[in-house]
Amino acid sequence: MASFHANSARKAFNSLQSAVTFYAHNVSAHAAMSLVADAVDIVVFVDREVTATGTVRYVSEILEVHELAENGQPASTPIFGPDPAREEFDPRGYPLHQPEGNALWARRAGLDLNWLHPSRGEWAQPFPERQLA
């Protein structure tokens, strides 16, 4: 497990690729992205927003990472993300669907995948009122 800073879950791939090529000068950009796709199981994106009561941090997206795709980026599946029906007033993530494949990463981490079932996808508290600009 590691912490890495990026502006979105998908932008984490390019940031990780840049780090690999910066520190391993003999690795091509394509090889670096392939290493990222092989090494990363999931990306958890924690976002933040200023609300009327202060800054709130929340999980907005979880991507399950797969092999390198033809476009040169790791293929990924959003398993947790914003609900379009609620996004206007609640940007937090909600379960979208179960992970693909055997989800070995989840078992290794002790994650009960039942928590990613849409019927269990409710936060304990409503999202705080947004601060007016």
Where are these regions (language model features)?
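Conserved P-loop NTPase nucleotide-binding/switch module
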Residues: 1-42, 50-58
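NTP-binding/hydrolysis catalytic cores, primarily Walker-type P-loop NTPases
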Residues: 53-133
